[in-house]
From Swiss-Prot:
This is Aspartate carbamoyltransferase catalytic subunit. InterPro entries: Asp/Orn_carbamoyltranf_P-bd, Asp/Orn_carbamoylTrfase, Asp/Orn_carbamoylTrfase_sf, Asp_carbamoyltransf, Asp_carbamoyltransf_Asp/Orn-bd. Keywords: Pyrimidine biosynthesis, Transferase. The lineage of its organism: Bacteria, Pseudomonadati, Myxococcota, Myxococcia, Myxococcales. PANTHER family: ASPARTATE CARBAMOYLTRANSFERASE, ORNITHINE CARBAMOYLTRANSFERASE, MITOCHONDRIAL. NCBIfam families: asp_carb_tr, PRK00856.1. GO terms for molecular function: amino acid binding; aspartate carbamoyltransferase activity. Belongs to the aspartate/ornithine carbamoyltransferase superfamily. ATCase family. Pfam families: OTCace, OTCace_N. Catalyzes the condensation of carbamoyl phosphate and aspartate to form carbamoyl aspartate and inorganic phosphate, the committed step in the de novo pyrimidine nucleotide biosynthesis pathway. It comes from Anaeromyxobacter sp. (strain K). Pathway: Pyrimidine metabolism; UMP biosynthesis via de novo pathway; (S)-dihydroorotate from bicarbonate: step 2/3.
Length: 313
């Protein structure tokens, strides 16, 4: 359990204390990643099934790595090689996999609400690895962990989220989590890529990039979610990059010296971020990837019923 939760589906559901429970444990889990032998017996005998209906590099490999470091058995399932291609429904697929008695189902799906639907029909814990444009809770948690690690705290800090906010499940999870940890959130992007009503969550909305990043402690850059966009919402990527992309000159002129830059990946280099910025000293993007393993270890440990001090044994 994470606090009162059997599942990890949306950070909208999580309290400040529950978010801190995960990232505090992740700090301990990260120590395991620094060891020569990256293996602990915490979830020996447990099974984690990764159920991915959408392409993924970082998230699926991160959950698989997290499970294996904790000594759990990990089964990777992809829709292209399954009975889904023969017309099997999501619920039937999940129930058949659950009949194999896994302890945790990790699911990514293009439809918002899919993990919650699955959770209503299975007895094991369910973790959302991203559902449509709804949420991506483990990414939100690893962003919280990375920011706390780099900034010391989120209390009183300002985070700017820039790009295709409307179609970004990462932005939604971050927007639900950051204010609970005391951070102020600014959203910036084209008006056509800004969801309605985000002000009620405490965020301020900007269309001017310089204004949005002025004095920010961290900037999270988002890619354009072409796969979720029907009609064109911007004139073109070149024009988008000129207005909302972050290059070395803008970073040097507009960002304060201590500001760090994050990106959930994959990066469209030369669009939202120039290579010089993505690979530069402000970037903590690869730290996010490493921290993602630690955070997902913490999630699996808490939900699969890891015992005692074995997490750090």
């Amino acid at each position: 359990m994470i606090g009162r939760h059997k599942h990890c589906i949306a950070l909208e559901d999580f309290s400040r204390e529950e978010i801190l429970e995960v990232i505090d444990l992740a700090a301990s889990m990260k120590e395991v990643l620094q060891r020569p032998i990256k293996k602990v017996p915490s979830l020996r005998g447990k099974m984690v099934v990764n159920l991915f209906f959408e392409a993924s590099t970082r998230t699926r490999s991160s959950f698989e790595t997290a499970a294996k470091i904790l000594s759990a058995d990990a089964l990777n399932w992809t829709s292209s090689s399954s009975s889904v291609t023969k017309g099997e429904t999501l619920v039937d697929t999940a129930r058949n996999l659950e009949a194999m008695r896994p302890d945790v189902l990790v699911i990514r799906h293009s439809a918002g609400g899919a993990p919650r639907l699955v959770a209503e029909h299975v007895g094991c814990s369910v973790v959302s690895a991203g559902d449509g444009a709804h949420e991506h809770p483990s990414q939100g948690l690893l962003d919280c962990f990375t920011l706390r690690e780099k900034l010391g705290t989120l209390e009183g800090k300002t985070v700017a989220i820039v790009g295709d906010v409307s179609h970004s499940r990462v932005a939604r999870s971050d927007l639900h989590a950051f204010p609970k940890l005391g951070a102020k959130v600014r959203l910036c992007g084209p008006p056509t890529m800004m969801p309605a009503g985000v002000e009620r969550l405490g965020a301020t909305v900007h269309t001017d990039l310089r204004e949005a990043v002025d004095g920010a402690d961290a900037v999270i850059m988002l890619r354009i979610q072409h796969e979720r966009i029907g009609d064109p919402l911007i004139p073109g990527t070149r024009e988008y990059s000129k207005v909302w992309g972050l290059n070395a000159k803008k970073a040097a002129d507009w960002l304060k010296p201590s500001c760090v830059i994050l990106h959930p990946g994959p990066i469209n280099r030369g669009v939202e971020l120039s290579p010089e910025v993505a690979d530069g000293p402000r970037s903590v993007i690869l730290d996010q990837v490493q921290n993602g393993v630690a955070v997902r270890m913490a999630i699996l440990y808490l939900l699969a019923g890891g015992a005692g001090e074995e997490a750090r044994a």
